[in-house]
Amino acid sequence: MAVESRVTQEEIKKEPEKPIDREKTCPLLLRVFTTNNGRHHRMDEFSRGNVPSSELQIYTWMDATLKELTSLVKEVYPEARKKGTHFNFAIVFTDLKRPGYRVKEIGSTMSGRKGTDDSMTLQSQKFQIGDYLDIAITPPNRAPPTSGRMRPY
């Protein structure tokens, strides 16, 4: 007698991320590119084997959170430690349909404040080994507005 599995796609998708044992799992090399003007790099800066010059190489795991990555970037760039500095994260990945790269914004963090994206992981955002991480850093004096509205009244 044959037994048929009745697992639905929703059940598969809702399965929580399995914790990674950092003692037993080898870390991956994460190539991070940063800007300090609040904007991500242009995709043509990643063309034909070229990459932006602002590369930071981090050994980490797929369960690394955006807050954890923010802390690592702040260790290297002291000016990013100021309270209110905004970090906007994007994954840069190879476009399988045409030559070049695509970008997918995944979340943001802020120095000195807790945020909803702090606990977001690379794994939860479908990051794959070989992708790049692009971080647009905005200093506190030029930070984007916290609310979506800019009204004079």
Curated annotation (Swiss-Prot):
GO terms for molecular function: transcription corepressor activity. InterPro entries: Hist_deAcase_cplx_SAP18, SAP18, SAP18_sf. The keyword Transcription applies. The modification N-acetylalanine is found at residue 2. One of its GO terms (cellular component) is cytoplasm. GO terms for biological process: mRNA processing; negative regulation of DNA-templated transcription; negative regulation of mRNA splicing, via spliceosome; positive regulation of apoptotic process; regulation of alternative mRNA splicing, via spliceosome; RNA splicing. Keywords: Acetylation, Cytoplasm, Isopeptide bond, mRNA processing, mRNA splicing, Nucleus, Repressor, Transcription, Transcription regulation, Ubl conjugation. Its main location: nucleus. It holds the Pfam family SAP18. This is Histone deacetylase complex subunit SAP18.
